[in-house]
Amino acid sequence: MALFRKFFYRKPPDGLLEITERVYVFDSCFTTDVFNDDKYQDYIGDIVAQLQCHFADASFMVFNFREGESQSLLANILSSYEMVVMDYPRQYEGCPLVTIEMIHHFLRSGESWLSLSQQNVLIMHCERGGWAVLAFMLAGLLLYRKQYIGEQRTLEMIYRQAPRELIQLLSPLNPIPSQIRYLHYISRRNVSAVWPPGDRALTLDCVILRNIPGFNGEGGCRPIFRIYGKDPLLATSNTPKVLFSTPKRSKYVRLYKKVDCELIKIDIHCHIQGDVVLECISLDADQQREEMIFRVMFNTAFIRSNILMLNRDEIDILWDAKDRFPKEFRAEVLFSEMDSVNQLDSMEVGGIGEKEGLPVEAFAKVQEMFSNVDWLDPTADAAALLFQQLTSSENIQLRKGLLSPNKKDFHLSSISPTKKQSDNVEDKLSNAELSTIYVHKQENNDVQGLIPQKQATIPDEKSGSSVIHEKMISLVHEEITQVVDINTGCLSSLDMTVPSTMNSSRPVLIDQNSKLDDQFGSLQSSSPTMIMSQQFPVSRSSSVLSSDFSPRLLSACPRFHSAPSALGITALLEDHAAFGDTKNSVKVSSAVVKIPSKQSSQQHPITVTPVVTKCTPSPPPLLPPLAPVVPVPSDDQMISQEKDMSQQAQKHPDLSSFPSLSPTQQKQSTSKLCQTILPTNHQLSSSNITKEPLQISPAPTPPPLPTPSTSSSSSCHCLPPDSMLSTTTALFRPPAPPPPPLQSPSTPRCSPVRTLASPPPPPAPTSSPVRMSGPPPPPPPPAPNSCPSRPAPPPPPPPPLASTSSPPRPAAPSPCQLHTSTSSPARPVPPPPPTLSTIRSSAPTPPLLPGATSAPSPPPPPPPCSSSNQLSAPPPPPPSFSKNNGSIAPPPAPPGGNAKLPGMRGRGPAPPSGPMSRSLQSGQAASRRSNLKPLHWVKVTRAMQGSLWEESQKTDEASKPPVFDMSELEHLFSAVLPSSDGKRSDKSGSRASGSKPEKIHLIDLRRANNCGIMLTKVKMPLPDLMSAILTLDDTILDADQVENLIKFTPTKEEAELLKGYKGDKQVLGECEQFFMELMKLPRVDSKLRVFLFKIQFPSQVSDLKRSLNIVNSSAEEIRGSAKLKRIMQTILSLGNALNQGTARGSAVGFRLDSLLKLSDTRARNNKMTLMHYLSKVLSEKLPELLDFPKDLASLELAAKVQLKSLAEEMQAINKGLEKVEQELTTSENDGPVSEIFRKTLKDFLSGAEAEVRSLTSLYSNVGRNADALALYFGEDPARCPFEQVVITLQNFVRLFVRSHDENCKQLDLEKKKALKEAEAEKTKKEPENAQKTKEPGNDKAKHNNSIKELDISLQSPAQTASAK
């Protein structure tokens, strides 16, 4: 069908651009030129005349996007041609969009008109300045009709039809993000049962800006907000108005810098409904000049989860302002249901006085202990003044009402179009409420300060001035003239509004009227002359124009005046017969230069001229690259190898005796040579091959070589032009062993490469065989396409090389030796130098490296049939040349020994000496060890000086290692079971036929192995796995398994590789079959990500909800703790006692970080701090406050929560829901394969949205509580966020508890010390008491002794003598 459309395609008339089938656009929409009335009428008339000749039986409808209430000039002109004209507004509050109702009306009208008859044609037109909305509506129509997929791609395709500078001229802001948002609304219309859904009345609570943009030159901004839309409190009025505007003169409109705060939170509390335009404007330092930060247009019916999260790519910004926004910029707009909006109570900062705390007199001793100690920061004077202001009775109230801006016209700066406020703004805006981060009352007298006078004026569109028009045209004049060359003129009015009436004499068909009534609903016509209109008056905003003028930013383009406009709809009834009767064959000479319109097909009408490339035939379906990549030798390496081989050839006179070929002969022979062997579809460009690595992988295991026959079929060896030398020494050269990278037991498959066109091959040249001197030749070989049916006995063992004679000079050199016979040994023709290899008796010629040949390696050849007369063993012809056994792969090379040509006499050629010889010998050694088990060591490639390995390389007999018995090694460490040679030859055929073919790997081997490991963990058949994915069954697959599946979804390159595979899919590897199965599902990667989100959604929501509850609990506990409040008041009294009589004294409050300075202020004896003293005083006088940490149970957990991370989690949940919704919409085009998937996903989405909506409400409440906590301590939420408040309190609590414990320990020590001292004193007094107790006994004894002595003295002398 596409071919028929191409043959029967008719170029559209001049002046029209075809967008898709039967949809055209006037080319005047792509220019800013202005026509006068006469020229414009001639321009339209010429196009209409061509249309009627081009589409003789067609009916036409014109959609016009214009401004104004009266009928447009286009409708007035086309009414005389019996064309239906429908007028739409070209903007909505300065944004090049229309309301969702207008979009729905346009889409239904366009779709119904085009589907009503195949002869109906739709034409789009816009007046000057309406190209942006016209492009959006065209993209919406294409998406609505499912002619294109992808919102951004479709919109960009439409914009490319006009010069790039046109949209930048017409719109100072980039409108594409908001337009894409509305295109999402259109493309996802099938998610909900009714589209468009009913307008939701919401309350816009606040706007949070994260990672502040820089708009003041100092890395910050001074933001204010304006909101435009329909007032939900006035159900009867659909007129948009200013719903909210931040007063400029408010003292809370201040500068926010990146270094001071990470986010800005602006409380708004404005009621909205339907289509809303939100503008964020940055004020200059003088609060007069305005600069647009961003603009967002959205519809409340499509707000999910009561939150709108935007990054810098999803907001309308100035064309050159993207660098002002950090990459991490986020704007969060939080909503709540209008009926359940909770008014925030006025928060008192708290009576931070001395009523409930200890009086100053209680700290009389502290002045002596902490005298002359600076415990406060010297810069804290400003903090004291701030607290005095914040605790005043006027400022602790949070909100009173919103100021109503006065109704005046004033223009924004050069970056914002103008708006007009409606008449009843003052009456309606009183219902909305304004608050910044900590919103306070505003007085009504601030209204006058909100509306300054104009500093400069911009010519209005209706003023008739053409100065601005000339400046606009001068910017894109060169580009516009390439599109159309029309003599421009100036109109006195840019808004072309002329009353339009339809021809009353035009007949009306009743049957068409009944059809169109059903299609167009409200567009019913009771009379042919009746014009149905709908009022769309648009209000203007209030702004100020800066004195500077920037033509690029279109300061001349005012904020599209949206005065009440009418949707003038001329009757939609068309009589096809009337068009046939009124056709006039009039020749009109067009005064307009014809514009070639772009041709297109029905499905993709808009085409871009492709880049002219060389005509290249498509290459044949070759096997895709397998593994691994062989490095391509450079040109220097190839030249050096050529020189080495030339020197080797000079050493052998028998090689240099051959006659040389002239360059012309070489070129001819080379071309003939390649054309003889390769078919046309196998020709490749060597220049392309040298730039692309050749990927090689082993082929299936080949069968062993049959016994050679005496007669064989020889084929010409294709020599590439790059490898041809000027002499035959390059052709007849000793073959070298194959390099190690190419050691393969079978013929590898080459990856398809890009080809260039080459002429078809001529017939193969006939060449007589070269006769050599020697014994008579054997019988001539059969035809090249034949092969012996039975094998012959092997030839006798070859004699030594020294006994052979050098071959004589050939009679006539031939570029392609088809048949040769000789009895003396002849050296085979080697491949080009980059691919030096020895032609083995059991393997064909090894593959050629890229760059060395212009053709891929031939397919697996038939079993070689060799004889003694063969000069070389070239590779057999491709499959098209072979008839028998052409698909049998060659056998592997035998382990050990030099490879020789089949049937050759004498020893094989010795490999060249030097480094190349060593490397080649090592490659041969590696091939000999291929049947042994590998030793997995870490190889050292370069011996360090003085190391053991350097010494081992010396030729010292003592250092030489012993010679190992290879047979013993093979017997002990063989990788495969050994088998006798006799049995091998006998059972070769049966083993080849019975062996299981190896798996073919198209994917990178490492990735394939990892994929196989992953599949072993899944442990289920692939069909069951696909079924689990489509049913989103989380009982079968868990999150880890789905994550692994996402990692192993095929990439775009892998998918293309697998699609190009045409062989048997059963022989593919496990990874390839898994990828094949995944590719059966459309957008399997997106489905798996949706599946993963569904599995993780409950845990994500529960974790986020738990964290939010912790923040709420901690904020409520801190604000509700009476003990903490009394302690704060006690600290205030303590500080005032210390600072009494100084500038820091008599404070009404203190900054929150001053709490930590209590531990830094030490007494003069350095034995205690103020924190210890505070604990001591509270223990003595207010002991009931010591357990205040028990009131802050959630403080520890709250200190671990970051509000930024909570915002990121909330954003991830919302983005995940958007992806779910997008996949649900896209999967409707998948067909029955995704039917269960859609049903399951729709059920999940309905429940998830309700849960996320409640989570968003909690998230918004947490944000308010976090800000209220900072305000509770008199802090600015922007400078002292919730995290800082909580961490400061946590550290204070820890320091207080530690100080209290230390005080308790110190008190215990003092008690013990006092006890010890008392005991010591008591012990000291006991000896004295004991001594005092002993002294009375001694006196008595002395008294007794004295009495005894007295008695003795009183005795008589006689008694004394008798006693002696």
Swiss-Prot record:
Entry keyword Hydrolase: yes
Entry keywords, A to Z: Hydrolase, Protein phosphatase
An MF annotation (GO) of this entry: phosphoprotein phosphatase activity
Gene3D superfamilies associated with the record: 2.60.40.1110, Formin, FH2 domain, Protein tyrosine phosphatase superfamily
Disordered: region residues: 614-934, 976-999, 1317-1364
Regions of compositional bias (Basic and acidic residues) in chain numbering: 1317-1351
InterPro entries: C2_domain_sf, FH2_Formin, FH2_Formin_sf, Formin_homology_domain, Prot-tyrosine_phosphatase-like, Tensin_C2-dom
Bias (Low complexity): 744-757
Comp. bias intervals (Polar residues): 657-690, 916-929, 1353-1364
Pfam family, one: FH2
Domain Phosphatase tensin-type: 9-193
Domain of life, source organism: Eukaryota
Domain (FH2): residue spans on this chain: 922-1322
Active site: 126
Residue stretches of biased makeup (Pro residues): 617-631, 734-743, 774-813, 856-865
Positions of the C2 tensin-type domain: 199-338
Residues in the signal sequence: none
Family the UniProt entry places it in: Belongs to the formin-like family. Class-II subfamily.
Stated name of the protein: Formin-like protein 6
Gene field: FH6
